[in-house]
């Protein structure tokens, strides 16, 4: 019995560190952002959730050279909010790391759908992206404007970073 109580107490102390009550929420159309998000969540011991679109994006949908592709149409429509197939509840988390690819210098509109569907009051948001070269830009700050009551801590492009790199970066933001 004493051993069980000690185990519970020590486990509770471990969860009071920088990543206690941290969730990683990601959207990935090709797998690049998914790998980064999973590596980061594993390093931090954070829970992870995938933003799943109702209609999965095809290669044709993602063709940024085609102005009629779904991703091009969504990015050019400020009111576009693609539907999400799964329910993600961040109510039990203090810090939410939102991961996404960069599309036309912005987060994909489905990420806005997620952000607008949550209660961010009293929560910290960190944004991480993957990019073909344009980097994070203003995408994190733009997203945080749609998260009422959030404490936006910052964001960074981690296309080539490891999970340990992400962990170190986030630790710095949460100090």
Segments predicted by a language model, with ranges:
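Positively charged n-region of N-terminal signal peptides that target proteins for export
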Residues: 1-4
């Amino acid at each position: 019995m004493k051993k069980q109580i000690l185990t519970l107490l020590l486990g509770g102390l471990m969860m009071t560190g920088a990543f206690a009550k941290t969730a990683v929420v990601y959207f990935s159309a090709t797998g690049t952002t998914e790998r980064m998000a999973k590596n980061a969540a594993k390093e931090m011991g954070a829970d992870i959730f995938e933003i799943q679109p109702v209609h999965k994006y095809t290669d044709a949908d993602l063709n940024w050279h085609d102005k009629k592709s779904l991703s091009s149409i969504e990015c050019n429509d400020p009111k576009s909010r693609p539907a999400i197939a799964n329910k993600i509840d961040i109510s039990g988390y203090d810090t939410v790391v939102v991961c996404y690819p960069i599309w036309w210098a912005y987060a994909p509109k489905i990420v806005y759908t997620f952000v607008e569907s949550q209660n961010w009051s009293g929560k910290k948001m960190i944004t991480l992206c993957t990019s073909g070269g344009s980097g994070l830009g203003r995408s994190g700050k733009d997203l945080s404007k749609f998260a009422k009551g959030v404490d936006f801590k910052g964001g960074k492009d981690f296309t080539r970073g490891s999970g340990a790199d992400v962990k170190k970066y986030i630790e710095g933001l949460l100090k």
